């Protein structure tokens, strides 16, 4: 920093900047709000929805988790699978891994082992060690 000064930590101000960034369609601003316990859960869902709309694989995967676990929304395995699918399409390795599990087990999607293998292959290419391990044992 110029002059050697420091900025005092101010979580409230940081949240304001993240919210503003999210409102200005900056997906990282939206995602930065995820781990903050001071955020209203309904608002958090809105910020994640916006991140997903802005093509954040992480945002879509988090929404999938919410629907799968009934966290802040009514549990809906089909919607969860749709969000995991979008996350995978955006090259989110964990989204692909989870979608592969869903396809293999037929949870929220039609059971399709061939498609599950393809999805695990993509997750493995994206760096998922778990997916690579599944393929090695298949």
Swiss-Prot record:
The reaction(s) this protein catalyses: a beta-lactam + H2O = a substituted beta-amino acid
GO biological process: response to antibiotic
GO molecular function terms listed in the Swiss-Prot or TrEMBL record: beta-lactamase activity
TPR repeat start and end residues: 1-28, 57-94, 97-130
Superkingdom of origin organism: Bacteria
UniProt keyword annotations, A-Z: Antibiotic resistance, Disulfide bond, Hydrolase, Repeat, TPR repeat
Assigned EC number: 3.5.2.6
Disulfide bonds: 22-30, 52-60, 88-96, 124-132
Class of this enzyme: hydrolase
Role description: Hydrolyzes 6-aminopenicillinic acid and 7-aminocephalosporanic acid (ACA) derivatives.
Family label: Belongs to the hcp beta-lactamase family.
Note: Antibodies against HcpB are present in sera from human patients infected by Helicobacter pylori.
Full protein name: Beta-lactamase HcpB
Taxonomy of the source species: Bacteria, Pseudomonadati, Campylobacterota, Epsilonproteobacteria, Campylobacterales
Encoding gene per record: hcpB
């Amino acid at each position: 920093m110029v002059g050697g000064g420091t900025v005092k930590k101010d979580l409230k101000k940081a949240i304001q900047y993240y919210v503003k960034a999210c409102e200005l369609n900056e997906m990282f601003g939206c995602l930065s709000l995820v781990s903050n316990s001071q955020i209203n859960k309904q608002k958090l869902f809105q910020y994640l929805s916006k991140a997903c709309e802005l093509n954040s694989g992480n945002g879509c995967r988090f929404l999938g988790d919410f629907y799968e676990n009934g966290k802040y929304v009514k549990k809906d395995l089909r919607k969860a699978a749709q969000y995991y699918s979008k996350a995978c399409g955006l090259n989110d390795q964990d989204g692909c891994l989870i979608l592969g599990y869903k396809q293999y087990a037929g949870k929220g999607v039609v059971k399709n082992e061939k498609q599950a293998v393809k999805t695990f292959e993509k997750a493995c290419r994206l760096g998922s060690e778990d997916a690579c391990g599944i393929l090695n044992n298949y």
